[in-house]
């Protein structure tokens, strides 16, 4: 552990479950790196992701965005190409970008949006994009004919959440440069979405634990009973 990390841990009581407000304040105090650290939530859920009926996945637009400039690749054809360009997509095309990803290992983008009629071609990228969490998916709104709306939401701060194989959801909610209230607003919107996404097959306690941390800082535990207060 580095000197700054050790200093940060002294500000936190590991046994305490903080209120969301206290946790956001501490997350900013413990973000001591000399760059604009990302503030991220880690939510342990009472689900078994090995079962299809206990998957937790979706997307939500954070009111204040994530503080990160998101590069959007749109795979479309026909009239949708100009529509995507006008909406502010960073890259727009079809088979040429699929080949570029396959042959050149090109990944200068953060989100991929595809129209439904392109999914036959995009499917060839499943093994490449899937492990990176970049594969377009209807549940997250990235497979759609309304590419303009999808791009606008992504640029406005839309984030995807998905439970991993350890039953944890990791989602960025802002930057060290954010005010506490903006982090709190983003936190509440995200938590509301995840609570609403609870699978009917999930039994027992749904929110096992909630923690927030900066890129280089320690985790700060949040009282899961008070997440929407």
Curated annotation (Swiss-Prot):
It comes from the Bacteria. InterPro entries: Ribosom_uL1_bac-type, Ribosomal_uL1, Ribosomal_uL1-like, Ribosomal_uL1/biogenesis, Ribosomal_uL1_3-a/b-sand, Ribosomal_uL1_CS. It holds the Pfam family Ribosomal_L1. One of its GO terms (biological process) is translation. Keywords: Repressor, Ribonucleoprotein, Ribosomal protein, RNA-binding, rRNA-binding, Translation regulation, tRNA-binding. GO terms for cellular component: large ribosomal subunit. Binds directly to 23S rRNA. The L1 stalk is quite mobile in the ribosome, and is involved in E site tRNA release. Protein L1 is also a translational repressor protein, it controls the translation of the L11 operon by binding to its mRNA. Part of the 50S ribosomal subunit. Belongs to the universal ribosomal protein uL1 family. This is Large ribosomal subunit protein uL1. The lineage of its organism: Bacteria, Bacillati, Bacillota, Clostridia, Eubacteriales.
């Amino acid at each position: 552990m580095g000197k700054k990390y050790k200093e940060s841990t002294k500000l936190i009581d590991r046994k305490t479950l903080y209120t969301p407000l206290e946790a956001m304040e501490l997350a900013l105090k413990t973000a001591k790196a000399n760059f604009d650290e990302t503030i991220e939530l880690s939510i342990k859920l009472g689900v078994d992701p090995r079962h299809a009926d206990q998957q937790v996945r979706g997307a939500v637009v954070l009111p204040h965005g994530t503080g990160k400039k998101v590069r959007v690749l749109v795979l479309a054809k026909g009239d949708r190409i100009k529509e995507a360009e006008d909406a502010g997509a960073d890259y727009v095309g079809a088979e040429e970008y699929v080949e570029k990803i396959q042959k050149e290992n090109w990944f200068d983008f953060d989100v991929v949006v595809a129209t439904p009629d392109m999914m036959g071609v995009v499917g060839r990228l499943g093994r490449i994009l899937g492990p990176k969490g970049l594969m377009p998916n209807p549940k997250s709104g990235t497979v759609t004919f309304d590419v303009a709306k999808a791009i606008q939401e992504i640029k406005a701060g839309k984030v995807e959440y998905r439970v991993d194989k350890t039953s944890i959801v990791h989602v960025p909610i802002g930057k060290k440069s954010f005010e506490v209230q903006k982090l709190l607003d983003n936190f509440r919107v995200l938590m509301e979405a995840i609570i609403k996404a609870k699978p009917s097959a999930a039994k027992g306690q749904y929110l096992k634990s909630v923690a927030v941390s900066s890129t280089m800082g320690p985790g700060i535990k949040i009282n899961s009973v008070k997440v929407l207060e």
